[in-house]
A protein has these predicted regions:
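Short, surface-exposed "cap/lid" segments of acyl-processing enzymes
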Residues: 1-38
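Hydrophobic/aromatic beta-strand patches that form the interior of the parallel beta-sheet core
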Residues: 2, 30, 105, 166-168, ...
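C-terminal catalytic-base region of ester-bond hydrolases, centering on the histidine
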Residues: 160-242
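Extracellular/periplasmic catalytic domains that process cell-envelope and extracellular macromolecules
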Residues: 22-24, 71-72, 80-81, 96-100, ...
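Solvent-exposed, acidic/flexible segments
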Residues: 8-15, 50-58, 82, 142-146, ...
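Serine-dependent carboxylesterase/thioesterase catalytic core
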Residues: 4-5, 29, 47, 55-154
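Short aromatic-enriched loop/helix-cap "lid" or pocket-rim segments at secondary-structure transitions
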Residues: 41-44, 115-120, 177-181, 206
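Cap/lid segment of the alpha/beta-hydrolase catalytic domain
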Residues: 36-52
């Protein structure tokens, strides 16, 4: 299994709670840091990754996944992506097909871009895209709703045949907005389950930044990966970061 972090994040901050639970459930868990080249201000901050363009980041993920399959002696693996990580999984599947991937789980994936609570729309309207790129990185530009990258990625649909998708969104997402834009539509040969984290558990108020630490989100992930298909989903408070 490969875990894929999001923008301005790293593998530890993103999955410090989820990764051990997946390991205890019997998975071999792999992750890595990607997406930094020193060309933007955000990427200069220690521990901050995922700032470079999504096409190149997807290539990094494809290479890492191939290495994991080779070392594990596996023909297929599962992938879990948070935020940009979910979109990169789609990038890999679209470029390389779904033959090497079994199950996919995404948490607050920016699959269709984001308005960033309106900020991305404003930046585009006032012509601040170049400033955004210099400060926040190409990843921020690529994930704007209607960007060239997102338009090309979704031109032939959201999914690829042969892959089982579980897509988790949170009502309190302030980064991927509107939050339902994370949800996917199944194409031929694919299965999609779109899940709002708060359905059946109103006390979990996880936002974009905290949802990978939500016990309920972790349980949904384990169930989707068939690591825990019989247990009930935990319903516990999980606070937002913002």
């Amino acid at each position: 299994m490969v875990l894929v972090h999001g923008t301005y994040a790293n593998q530890y901050d993103s999955f410090a709670r989820m990764a051990p639970e997946l390991k205890w459930a019997g998975y071999c868990v792999y992750s890595f840091n990607y997406g930094t080249d020193g060309t933007d201000a955000a990427g200069q901050i220690p521990g901050v990754y995922g700032t470079t363009g999504l096409s190149g980041n997807g290539d990094e993920l494809a290479a890492f996944a191939a290495t994991v399959r080779e070392r594990a002696g596996a023909s297929k693996l599962d992938m879990v992506g948070w935020s940009q990580g979910g979109t990169l999984i789609t990038d890999v599947l679209k470029k390389h097909g779904g033959g090497g991937v079994d199950d996919v789980v995404t948490l607050a994936g920016s699959h269709h871009g984001t308005t960033l609570s309106g900020l991305a729309t404003i930046a585009e309207a006032v012509g601040a895209t170049d400033l955004t790129r210099a400060g926040l990185g190409q990843a921020a530009v690529d994930q704007m709703q209607g960007s060239e990258y997102i338009t090309a990625l979704t031109a032939d649909g959201d999914t690829v045949p042969g892959v089982d998708y579980t897509v988790i969104g949170t009502k309190y997402d302030e980064v991927v907005t509107p939050y339902r834009s994370t949800f996917l539509t199944a194409g031929p040969g694919a299965t999609v389950r779109n899940i709002t984290l708060q359905d059946g558990c109103a006390i979990d108020v996880s936002d974009h930044l905290s949802m990978t630490h939500s016990p309920r989100a972790i349980d949904i992930t384990k169930r989707a990966l068939k690591a825990d298909g019989s247990g009930t989903l935990r319903c516990l408070p999980n606070a937002p970061v913002l």
